Amino acid sequence: DDGLRERLLVIVGSDKRGTIYGLFHLSEIFGVSPFVNWCHVMPVHRDEVRLSTDMACIAKEPSVEYRGFFINDEWPAFGTWSEHHFGGPNAKAYEPIFELLLRLKGNYLWPAMWSARFEDDGPGLLNAELADEYGVIMGMSHHEPCLRQGEEYKYLRGKDSIYGDAWNFKTNREGIIRFWEDGLKRSGKFENVITVGMRGEADTAIMGKGATLADNIELLRDVLRTQRKLIQENVNEDLSKVPRMIALYKEVEAFFYGDETTQGLIGSKELCDVILMLCDDNYGNLRTLPTEEMRKHPGGYGMYYHFDYHGWPTSYEWINSSYLPKIWEQMTQAYDFGVQKLWIVNVGDIATQEFPLSFFMDLAYDFERWGTTAPNTTDAYTRLWVKRQFGRLSEVQQAQIADILTDYTRMIHKCRPEALRPETYHAANYREGSRVLAEAGRVMQTAQDLYDELERDAPEILPAYVALVWYPAMGTMNVLKLQLLSGMNHYLAEIGALSANDYAKEAKACLDADQKIIEQYHRSDDARWYGMGLSQHIGFTNWNEDECKNPLLMQVLPLQKPTIIATVDGTVQHVEGSPWLNQRMTISDFLNPECRCASISLYSRSELPASFRVIEKPEWIVLSAMDGTLDGEENKRLTIDVTVDESALAMALTDGRTQGMIRLELPAGICKISVPVDRSTYEYGNNTFVDTQGWIAIEAEHYSRCKDGFDREGQPMQWKCLAGYGKTLSAMKAFPTDSYADAENGAPYIEYSIVTKQAGDYEAEFYMQPSNPVTTENRLQYAVSVNGVPMQILDAVTDDFKIGDHQPVWARGVLDQIRRRSVPVQLEQGINTIRVYPVTPGFVLEKIVIYPHGNKPAEAYLGPTETYRCRS
């Protein structure tokens, strides 16, 4: 009847999962977070909830059919956690994980597998039965075919076993077939995406090094034929009703493509209806992607992505170090290339990955909202995510949390915790170490201040805040501080400054804080996360934690005479003033017409009182101290700010330039510090970079012109800025992301205007995202044209570029999160233009540094800071 109809709340799904999604969508409308049970994110109390007819909706089909995550590398963290709370990875442990997956609108899961047996640990089949009840589609990892895990074979194998004692399809064919067959009989009745193919045990290649490519391909073809028959016999004769997937992971990718002399598995009938799961390089950079012809494959394509990895060159497993703009850039490109059937991400232990996992799942579920047509929306997503978890807090507090999440992930993604070294960031050049140290300190201070506020005013919110924000931010930034302080200690120790010992003390305090932060996380929320912080994460010297070490700290012993050493901050210049050695330094900061402040630092090298005084300087140079005494104890260091009296300077300028000299008397002698100044008025166009310091450094988004164009097919193509992307400011990338361009025939370009003092030979160094070629042709090309002369087609990688273990060029790129390529260019005196064109997909430009040949600017992890540019 009509009256009853008006009082009905109807939730209908096309299947069980659809109905569950509807229920959870309703809970989100009520303000319930997907992490309500996983992280105890408690919703706002309401006495009543009102529904209105305008809330009625029909959900669209998800953008990606199979969306999920992989629990991996689970010891010691996830393994200890599950043992401590549930007695192991059993159904009690998986129940909250299944719920979390569904609340995130996922449907697909690879279970833990290092020492776990999902189908046995329930106990028995209880894990699988519970997954089926929840509507979770199960799969097994890239090297675990036919619904059986590697640990199962390890447990069941033996000389008297019906499955034999060798994971070898050639020597133990019948045993392996029976092992697979029994797995299909046991678990094929549940909803699965069945992994097919075969790799070696424990994530290795299936055949030895002596096997040829053809040998491997033929073996894999035999395996696939056998598995196809087994699935028909034991699951469903109609294979169109049985989703199957092969992971083209590591060496399997080569078996799929073959080479110029060996036909690979591409296009083979054994794979005609199988999902082809492509992979990243384990560090968040896509490997090959489907060509336009390949996209016709009936089975569709998947992507295996990583937020966690256990492997060469350096594992990263402790705390989230993935950055949303990078995830967006890579996964939107995957989708644009037709990878739309299956997405799965390795989340390690799950804990601390909740933030990027949410984005990954939302991107897969609703690509229209968050995908390629919505660039630069990760900040908006972050604010929305924070509101979902912490809507009870004030807008100011929510904004602080959003900043913490963005800042800590941006900073730790530049170099993951395990790969950080004291020398990663330069302790002196461009003030890099001190700049990053200050930024890390700000993040930690904000996170701790907010913790204190919540502890006082809203303790019920504290458990979720600790799990989702405080612990990952404090943990990663503290390790970053530890390595930065150690680097400062090393640098100052090398020049004999006693302040090095203070940095050593601060570094030791960070090391102590590391354990305290983890212990606080483990105690939080009634020890809910006990075990999740146990992964080693400091000073990896090998690919794994073996022989990892805390930073080496140096102690400086005081000299037995009064001694001061002077430095120019932002450089490695240092002098004592001795007449027998170099007495001169230069403050070049004021060669940038926008610079208004520089500094000199004085350091004690002795515990005896040592005096200094400025005995000469021009009137226009203003110093924050003219004399003083250091004693190596209470006063070990003094920083003297150097500024300019602009009115006095104006009287000294000739053609906008001048140079002053500071004569500083130290115990060992006179230090002479040159201070050249440029206050010229450069009347060039907006974003014209002028060489005032001997080199030019350009952030990619500061182009003088950006011209749209066309791809090879005549379709519109354009450059877009990716805000916040990369290691410094942002990046530029051409869209559509799957388009190829002819640089000499209508391609879009970005143009940079630069002014040089002299004509001659220069180097242009391009800083690029460490992308990989999207095809086996091994090309990642862009083009450069200088002053309109014939352009150069350049390649970001060499002809012999390879991805994988013991490939140093690739490894350097993924560890440093940058790839650099220098190109010789001829520049004229005065204004020059450099145009950059896309050629192949995947090229992402972050920075350009230009310098005279043979005069490269000082090195630093982030590269030289941006130099002077005209602003209109």
Language model: regions and residue ranges:
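Glycine- and acidic
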Residues: 7, 77-84, 110-113, 159-165, ...
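Beta-sheet-dominated interaction scaffolds and their linkers
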Residues: 537, 541-605
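Feature activates predominantly on carbohydrate-active enzymes
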Residues: 1-169, 248, 268-285, 292-324, ...
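Structured mid-domain segments that build the active-site/substrate or prosthetic-cofactor binding neighborhood
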Residues: 102, 107-110, 120, 278-284, ...
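Extracytoplasmic
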Residues: 593-872
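Gly/Pro-rich turn-and-neighbor structural signature
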Residues: 42-52, 122-125, 130-133, 160-298, ...
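C-terminal non-catalytic alpha-helical accessory regions
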Residues: 45-47, 382-540, 740-741, 748-750, ...
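Short secondary-structure boundary/capping segments
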Residues: 84-86, 124-128, 153-158, 210-216, ...
